[in-house]
Amino acid sequence: MQYSEIMIRYGELSTKGKNRMRFINKLRNNISDVLSIYSQVKVTADRDRAHAYLNGADYTAVAESLKQVFGIQNFSPVYKVEKSVEVLKSSVQEIMRDIYKEGMTFKISSKRSDHNFELDSRELNQTLGGAVFEAIPNVQVQMKSPDINLQVEIREEAAYLSYETIRGAGGLPVGTSGKGMLMLSGGIDSPVAGYLALKRGVDIEAVHFASPPYTSPGALKKAQDLTRKLTKFGGNIQFIEVPFTEIQEEIKAKAPEAYLMTLTRRFMMRITDRIREVRNGLVIINGESLGQVASQTLESMKAINAVTNTPIIRPVVTMDKLEIIDIAQEIDTFDISIQPFEDCCTIFAPDRPKTNPKIKNAEQYEARMDVEGLVERAVAGIMITEITPQAEKDEVDDLIDNLL
């Protein structure tokens, strides 16, 4: 027998009252986006559950993709069969012969949405249980926590059988908590921060600062590949490339070395906030982890934050590096993050960055520059690319493959 569909049960959105259908519709769209790489699969959703109709697609691959989608509590692969007692009996026997191992217990759990079916739920449990005994005479029934719970659902159009329940990612459907701008470098921390924001329903757009010729096409492709890894949790992501060369050269020419990182981060924050405003975002998200580097002390965070009143979410701020690496490996971003391409935060990094920068000093050094003009030109020069779960291999991929 071949699975015909996957029955999907919702997570936390079940508590959302009047907004329930908005959450469900968003989850349906997210599932459709993530499963778009399987052209045969069709997704529907109603108030109680969603369904992914396989239409011949490989169940194992689709299930692996579904495990990543936030807002799903669990799901079950389902067999669709003819709605007749004899077909149900033979189907139940076939399934049990395939999955039963010596000593296992079972029960039948039936429900009907088609109340015109010839047997009610209790009668169906008894009839199908009897069919199992015919196929496996020594099998034991156990009503509480059996090894196999064979679920039977009689609907208007057909009957559906399932026995396996697979845990989903939980969380909230991406996009139900508003939009945030993720400051995405090529490092380990910021993709993890993006993942954790996605889990709480934030629709992220990735803002990446590029400083050619100091940063290479490989560094840009690396950031896009990290973004692509995040699409499997909620669908397509807008990747915003910011030209940052002029600003970094200006900072290096007009500010003391100890303040290079502080001023760089202040400009990044200003630009990200300006993009957020234009694109209707609510928050800025970054991968800062307290004390991990010089720009991530509390004093540095205060000096950098001073350029905006927008809330800054730091999902990994209290984690140590090993905790962050564990998550990066789990979400499959770690190997990309450690590729040897420098980002714009490292190319002009001073030997002795200031760990307790003063806001008044930062403002004094910025007074030597045309801050507003620099920000405006950077924002005017952004390039936006929609990153999808699947992308064709290009020349930069080939170059990277040759280098690694």
From Swiss-Prot:
Cell compartment(s), UniProt: Cytoplasm
Domain THUMP span(s) in chain numbering: 60-165
GO CC, one annotated term: cytosol
An individual GO BP term: tRNA 4-thiouridine biosynthesis
Cited Gene3D superfamilies: 3.30.2130.30, HUPs
Top EC group: transferase
Superkingdom as given in the UniProt entry: Bacteria
Residues that coordinate or bind ATP: 183-184, 208-209, 265, 287, 296
EC number(s) recorded for this UniProt protein: 2.8.1.4
Catalyzed reaction equations: [ThiI sulfur-carrier protein]-S-sulfanyl-L-cysteine + a uridine in tRNA + 2 reduced [2Fe-2S]-[ferredoxin] + ATP + H(+) = [ThiI sulfur-carrier protein]-L-cysteine + a 4-thiouridine in tRNA + 2 oxidized [2Fe-2S]-[ferredoxin] + AMP + diphosphate; [ThiS sulfur-carrier protein]-C-terminal Gly-Gly-AMP + S-sulfanyl-L-cysteinyl-[cysteine desulfurase] + AH2 = [ThiS sulfur-carrier protein]-C-terminal-Gly-aminoethanethioate + L-cysteinyl-[cysteine desulfurase] + A + AMP + 2 H(+)
Keyword Kinase: no
CDD domains tied to this protein: PPase_ThiI, THUMP_ThiI
Keywords carried by this UniProt record: ATP-binding, Cytoplasm, Nucleotide-binding, RNA-binding, Thiamine biosynthesis, Transferase, tRNA-binding
One MF annotation (Gene Ontology) recorded for this entry: tRNA binding
Main localization, broad class: cytoplasm
Functional pathway: Cofactor biosynthesis; thiamine diphosphate biosynthesis
InterPro entries: Rossmann-like_a/b/a_fold, ThiI_AANH, ThiI_fer, ThiI_N, THUMP_dom, THUMP_ThiI, tRNA_STrfase, tRNA_sulfurtransferase_ThiI
Function text: Catalyzes the ATP-dependent transfer of a sulfur to tRNA to produce 4-thiouridine in position 8 of tRNAs, which functions as a near-UV photosensor. Also catalyzes the transfer of sulfur to the sulfur carrier protein ThiS, forming ThiS-thiocarboxylate. This is a step in the synthesis of thiazole, in the thiamine biosynthesis pathway. The sulfur is donated as persulfide by IscS.
Family note: Belongs to the ThiI family.
Protein name, UniProt field: Probable tRNA sulfurtransferase
Native organism taxonomy: Bacteria, Bacillati, Bacillota, Bacilli, Lactobacillales
Gene of this entry: thiI
